[in-house]
Swiss-Prot record:
DNA ligase that catalyzes the formation of phosphodiester linkages between 5'-phosphoryl and 3'-hydroxyl groups in double-stranded DNA using NAD as a coenzyme and as the energy source for the reaction. It is essential for DNA replication and repair of damaged DNA. Its cofactor is Mg(2+); Mn(2+). This is DNA ligase. The keyword Oxidoreductase does not apply. It is an enzyme of class 6 (ligase). Belongs to the NAD-dependent DNA ligase family. LigA subfamily. One of its GO terms (biological process) is DNA replication. NAD(+) binds at residues 44-48, 93-94, 124, 147, 187, 304, 328. PANTHER family: CHROMOSOME TRANSMISSION FIDELITY FACTOR 18, DNA LIGASE. Residues 606-695 form the BRCT domain.
Length: 695
C-alpha cells in the first residue's frame, strides 16, 4: 500500500509530464500578456486549445492535478466564513501629505534623520482598492490574506486564486532566483470601465449597485463563494514585498518592483525614480493632472525611500513608516443646486444644518446632502435655498458646501429659515452664551435619544456589538428604549416578535448588551455624552475621582484641579451631575449592575515603581508605541497622564518632533525624558512593553 503513490506516479509518461509543465508555463505567460500587458501574442482560439489540452491530460492523469494548475483557479466550495491570518510583518498604513510644502517637510525629515542629502525616492500611483498579501512558498501561491487592521487579516486564498492576473506559480526567467518564502503585497482593484459594466449588468438584473470601484473590489474579494469572486473583473497590482527568506532581497525599492515584474507579477504602473524632492513634486503634479483619465481609481501618489536598508533604519511611528508617505489628491469638487436646508439634532441637542442637494456624482459617489456646520457658516457663505454651490468631498469622505455661485441666481432663491423650534420635538431652541450653535433643550427629544443611544453603544463607548443605527433607531421608534438605562431592561419577548429578529440574533444582542455592563469606568463616562467630555476627558475624570459617587459630589473647584480642565468643561460636568434627571439615570444604571467605579483603584494605589503617582505628559511621536498604547501603559504603572504641562508635572516624555509642550517644560524646568527612559521606567514598573506594542 505504501508504494501505491509511487506506482501511480510512474504511470505518467515523462513526455506527458513535460508537456503538462510546458502548457502551464505557456498559459501563465499568455495570461500575463493578456491581463497585465494588454498585448496578447496568441488568439483566443489558440489559448482555449492549450487550456483544453491541459484539462484533458489532467483528466487522463489525475495525479498531475496540483493547486497551482491554471485549471484549478475556481473549484473550492463556498466557505462558512474566513479564517484569520496573523501578518508576521505588519502591513502598515501610510501617513498623508496634502501640499508641495508638506512633501518638502516630509523629505526634510528624511534627510535630517538619515544624515544624508542624496536620498532617492520612488513615486507610484496609490491605487484605490483592497490591500492584500500573497504568500509564495517554493514558487507556489499558498495563501492570500486581506490587510485587515495591519496585524490580523482574513484568509481569502481561494478567492485570490480566481484573479487571473495573479500567478498561481512563479516561473522565473533564467538567472533569476525566487526565494523559498516570498510575500508579495499589493492592491486588488477594479478598473473604472469594468466597474461601470458590472453596475450596468447588476442594474439590469435588479441587484443593488456598488457605490464605487473600491467597494466593488472589496465586496467581490470577500465573497464566501469563490465562484462569485471569479465572475467579477478583479485586478491586482503589487507595490512591495513582506516576508523574504532564503536569499538576499533587492537593495532598492525600484529593484524590488523590477524583480516582481520578471516573475510576471503585475506591479503598480508607471513608477518613477526621483533623485530630488523637486522631481517628486513634479511627479505628484503629473499624476494629479491625469487623475481623471486613468483606467483605475487613484486617490494619491505613494512616495517611498528607494534604499531599502535606509527605509528600515528610518523606522516606524505608530503604524506609519517614516520612509514612505502618500500625497493625497485634493478632494473632488462639483457644482450642484441646494434644494433645501434641513436641521439634524444630535445627542447634546445641537442643531446642524444640512444642505439637500440636487444629486451629483463626486469621486464615484452620489452626493445628495452636505454639511453646513452651523448658522454662522450659512451667513458666511451667503447661502440661499436654490443657490448653485460648490460641493467638496473633504478627504473624499464627508461632503461639504464650500462656496456659493451668486452670479447664477435667477431671483427664485429664498433665505434659509433658522429654526426657533426643534424640528423633531417642537421645543424652543436656545443659543448658549459664547457659542454659535443652536440647541434643542428637551432631554426627551426623540432625535436626541436616538443619537444618544448610538453614541452610548459605539465602539469607543460601551461597544455593544450588533446595536447599530438601524436597530437602535427602531427600538426608540417603537418605544422599546425611552431612556439610556432602558437598554438593560429590554423586553426581549417583544423583540422576538419583530420582523427580522430571530432567536439567535436576539440572543447575541442580549449577550452583547449584558457584557457592556463591565466596561471600564472611563468608557461609561464617555458613553453618557456629557458636553465637552470626550474620551480623554472621560479618562481624566475616571483617574481623578475613581467612582461615580465621588464624581457626582465634585465641586467646580475640584473639577478645575484636573490638569487640562478649563471653566467650560468643569461647568458642563458639574451641571450634568446636578441635574436631577441625570442623577436618577445614574441610580438606574447602578441598580441594573453597570460598573461605575475603577475596580483597579486599590491595585493602582499599591503600584511600586518610578511612575507611581507621577503626573506625566507625552509630546512628539513615539517609535515603539502608539500614543494611546503609551497612555494606557502609563496609567497601569500608576501615573496620571495629562494634556498640558504645569508646575505640577513630574515628567515630560518627548518623542520625535516634539511640540510646544517641550518648550513649556523647558520654561518651567520640568524634567524632559526620552522614549528610552519611558520604556525603561515602564519595565521597572512591571509593565510588559513588548507585548503591549504587538497588541
Amino acid at each position: 500500500m505504501a508504494e501505491q503513490p509511487a506506482l501511480q506516479a510512474d504511470r505518467v509518461p515523462p513526455e506527458v509530464r513535460a508537456r503538462v509543465e510546458e502548457l502551464r508555463r505557456l498559459i501563465q505567460r499568455y495570461n500575463y500578456e493578456y491581463y497585465v500587458l494588454n498585448a496578447p501574442t496568441v488568439s483566443d482560439a489558440e489559448y482555449d486549445a492549450l487550456m483544453l489540452e491541459l484539462r484533458r491530460w489532467e483528466e487522463q492523469y489525475p495525479e498531475l492535478v496540483t493547486p497551482d494548475s491554471p485549471t484549478q483557479r475556481v473549484g473550492a466550495p463556498p466557505a462558512e466564513g474566513f479564517a484569520t491570518v496573523q501578518h508576521e510583518i505588519p502591513m502598515l498604513s501610510l501617513g498623508n501629505v496634502f501640499s508641495d510644502g508638506e512633501i518638502r517637510a516630509w523629505a526634510e525629515r528624511v534627510y535630517r534623520l538619515s544624515g544624508r542629502q542624496d536620498v532617492e525616492f520612488v513615486t507610484e500611483p496609490k491605487v484605490d482598492g483592497l490591500a492584500v498579501s500573497l504568500l509564495y512558498r517554493d514558487g507556489v501561491l499558498v495563501r492570500g490574506a486581506t490587510r485587515g487592521d495591519g496585524y490580523t487579516g482574513e484568509d481569502v486564498t481561494n478567492n485570490v486564486r480566481t484573479i487571473r492576473m495573479i500567478p498561481l506559480r512563479l516561473y522565473p526567467p533564467e538567472g533569476v532566483i525566487v526565494p523559498p518564502v516570498l510575500e508579495v503585497r499589493g492592491e486588488v482593484y477594479m478598473n473604472v470601465r469594468d466597474f461601470e459594466r458590472l453596475n450596468r449588468e447588476r442594474g439590469e438584473q435588479g441587484l443593488p449597485l456598488f457605490a464605487n470601484p473600491r467597494n466593488a473590489a472589496a465586496g467581490s474579494l470577500r465573497q464566501l463563494d469563490p465562484s462569485v469572486t471569479a465572475s467579477r473583473p478583479l485586478r491586482f497590482a503589487a507595490w512591495d514585498i513582506g516576508l523574504w527568506e532564503g536569499t538576499e532581497p533587492p537593495a532598492t525599492h525600484l529593484a524590488t518592483l523590477e524583480f516582481l515584474r520578471q516573475l510576471q507579477i503585475p506591479v503598480v504602473p508607471d513608477y518613477r525614480l526621483c533623485r530630488s524632492v523637486d522631481e517628486v513634486i513634479a511627479e505628484c503634479h503629473r499624476w494629479q493632472e491625469r487623475r481623471d483619465a486613468l483606467e483605475f481609481e487613484a486617490d494619491g501618489v505613494v512616495i517611498k525611500v528607494n534604499d531599502r536598508a535606509l527605509y528600515q533604519a528610518l523606522g516606524v511611528v505608530g503604524r506609519e513608516p517614516r520612509g514612505a508617505t502618500a500625497y493625497k489628491f485634493p478632494a473632488h469638487e462639483k457644482t450642484t443646486i441646494v434644494r433645501d436646508v434641513i436641521w439634524s439634532v444630535g445627542r447634546t441637542g445641537k442643531l446642524t444644518p444640512v444642505a439637500v442637494l440636487e444629486p451629483v456624482e463626486i469621486g464615484g459617489v452620489i452626493v445628495e446632502r452636505a454639511t453646513l456646520h452651523n448658522e454662522e457658516e450659512i451667513r458666511r457663505l451667503g447661502l440661499l435655498i436654490g443657490d448653485a454651490v460648490v460641493v467638496q468631498r473633504r478627504g473624499d469622505v464627508i461632503p461639504k458646501v464650500v462656496a456659493t455661485i451668486p452670479q447664477r441666481r435667477d431671483g427664485d432663491e429664498r433665505p434659509v429659515d433658522i429654526p426657533r423650534q426643534c424640528p423633531v420635538c417642537g421645543a424652543h431652541t436656545i443659543r448658549l452664551e459664547g457659542e454659535v450653535d443652536r440647541y434643542c433643550p428637551n432631554p426627551n427629544c426623540p432625535a436626541r435619544l436616538k443619537a444618544s443611544v448610538r453614541h452610548f453603544a459605539s465602539r469607543n463607548a460601551m461597544d455593544i456589538e450588533g446595536l447599530g443605527e438601524k436597530i437602535s433607531d427602531l427600538f426608540v421608534d417603537l418605544g422599546i428604549i425611552r431612556s439610556l438605562p432602558d437598554l438593560y431592561e429590554i423586553d426581549w419577548a417583544r423583540v422576538l416578535q419583530l420582523e427580522g429578529f430571530g432567536p439567535k440574533k436576539v440572543e447575541n444582542l442580549r449577550k452583547a448588551i449584558e457584557a457592556s455592563k463591565n466596561r471600564p469606568f472611563a468608557r461609561f463616562l464617555f458613553a453618557l455624552g456629557i458636553r465637552h467630555v470626550g474620551e480623554r476627558n472621560a479618562q481624566l475624570l475616571a483617574d481623578h475621582f475613581r467612582s461615580i459617587d465621588r464624581l457626582m459630589e465634585a465641586t467646580i473647584d475640584e473639577l478645575l484641579q484636573i490638569p487640562g480642565f478649563g471653566p467650560a468643561v468643569a461647568q458642563s460636568v458639574f451641571e450634568f451631575f446636578r441635574e436631577p434627571k441625570n442623577r436618577e439615570m445614574i441610580e438606574r444604571f447602578r441598580r441594573l449592575g453597570v460598573r461605575m467605579a475603577e475596580e483597579e483603584a486599590a491595585a493602582v494605589a499599591t503600584v511600586q515603581g518610578p511612575l507611581a503617582g507621577k503626573t506625566v505628559v507625552l509630546t512628539g511621536r513615539l517609535e515603539t508605541l502608539t500614543r494611546s498604547q503609551a497612555e494606557e501603559l502609563l496609567r497601569r504603572a500608576g501615573a496620571h497622564v495629562t494634556d498640558s504641562v504645569s508646575r505640577k508635572t513630574d515628567y515630560v516624555f518627548a518623542g520625535a518632533d516634539p511640540g510646544s509642550k517641550y518648550v513649556r517644560a523647558q520654561q518651567l524646568g520640568v524634567p524632559i525624558l526620552g522614549e528610552e527612559d519611558l520604556l525603561r521606567m515602564l519595565r521597572e514598573s512591571g509593565i510588559e512593553v513588548e507585548a503591549a506594542a504587538r497588541s
